[in-house]
């Protein structure tokens, strides 16, 4: 006997429909899987690229920090050398001993002009300013950074960043000896936009530099910067947001015009001065 075949046209259509539905689902599944794998691969590659950029930026910042330290030390040495030459000059020591203010001020101005210093101050043994090229007509006032004088007395020289009259200076203090100390010379260069531009231009690395005052509970102020104006305005808030995380390791800061890999170097300041930081 031969069995009768009951599959008609309707049954074949249903079979084809099921097959097509399964094929569609399979296609969608593999397409989704492919896109998922592609997305995961893209994110992995992107993360690797970002990490590589960060690592390169970190290495560049570490190198820039060494260049910065070398530049600062060279400035300190030049200031100290000039101050020590004046301090050992017999005529100058005589003027100091006799309190000849006109001669003292003239000598301080000549020294500043000769070594491109922006401010030269003579401080007596009572920490009082007796002559100041930055404020020549001022009445006698105390030199605000006792710590610098005390360190210079112990070590024959002291250097530090300070904020004086709202301006950042790099100061060097040396004694005037006859043969014991009879006064102190504080000689400084202003850390201004020209100083920051010179450092950036001398660097072989593409970087910006900001000198920021304050920190932590004092709040931040971007006093001098090579950053664009909008980014400079954003910087204090971005630094404050990082808070205690800011240290010797680079951090990423989000500013107006993009992300910056940043290294914050806390510079040496006297105990009486607001803190000064170099933000590279």
Where are these regions (language model features)?
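Short clusters of small/polar residues that mark proteolytic maturation junctions
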Residues: 134-135, 173, 186, 225-228, ...
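Short hydrophobic alpha-helical segments used for membrane anchoring or interfacial signaling
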Residues: 120-127, 207-217
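Short, hydrophobic beta-strand elements of compact beta-sandwich sensory domains
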Residues: 182-190, 261-280
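Generic short beta-strand
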Residues: 119-121, 174, 209, 250-251, ...
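Juxtamembrane extracytoplasmic/periplasmic/luminal helical "stalk" adjacent to the first N-terminal
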Residues: 22-28, 36-98, 113-118, 160, ...
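Extracytoplasmic/periplasmic sensor domains and loops in membrane signaling proteins
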Residues: 97-107, 113-116, 128-163, 191-206, ...
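Positive-inside N-terminal membrane-insertion signal
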Residues: 1-35
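A short beta-strand signature within small-molecule sensing/ligand-binding domains used
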Residues: 166-175, 247-250, 256-266, 274-275
